[in-house]
């Protein structure tokens, strides 16, 4: 990215169903004010200048799923200049590691949110919402699609 003031650039992603040839939707980065609710940036479509790593450190390797969320939230809290692009920068096939480990992702997102969010109850509230959504999704899949 040519603008030297931009330290992190996040773009859009085309989302594909498994083995599909056409995307079924485009995911856009959300406004940065959404950090307390979950990751607003699309990790695979995000580029970070080397100087940012020198300034705020690397990803937290103790986090299996949410290391990217923690890093970007830390960057945001340290006033790193984060910009969005409307361009699709990557194609993603659904069913990745986060999708396959929703409970761990929800737990780690709560941990990260608790560390950085100024409203300390919000990460726990969002964690509860994610868990309820996951339980409903599992119930619907098992009862209406016959999966076990």
Q: Where does each model-flagged region fall?
A:
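A recurrent flexible, glycine/aromatic-enriched loop bordering the glycosyltransferase active site
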Residues: 16-23, 29-51, 55, 70
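A short, conserved alpha-helix in the catalytic core of glycosyltransferases
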Residues: 40, 46, 52-57, 62-91
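Feature marks short, surface-exposed loop/turn motifs that line or immediately flank catalytic pockets
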Residues: 15-19, 91, 98
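Catalytic core of nucleotide-sugar-dependent glycosyltransferases
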Residues: 88, 92, 99-124
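Accessory recognition modules or surfaces
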Residues: 32-33, 37-38, 96-105
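Conserved donor NDP-sugar-binding/catalytic core segment of glycosyltransferases
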Residues: 1-23
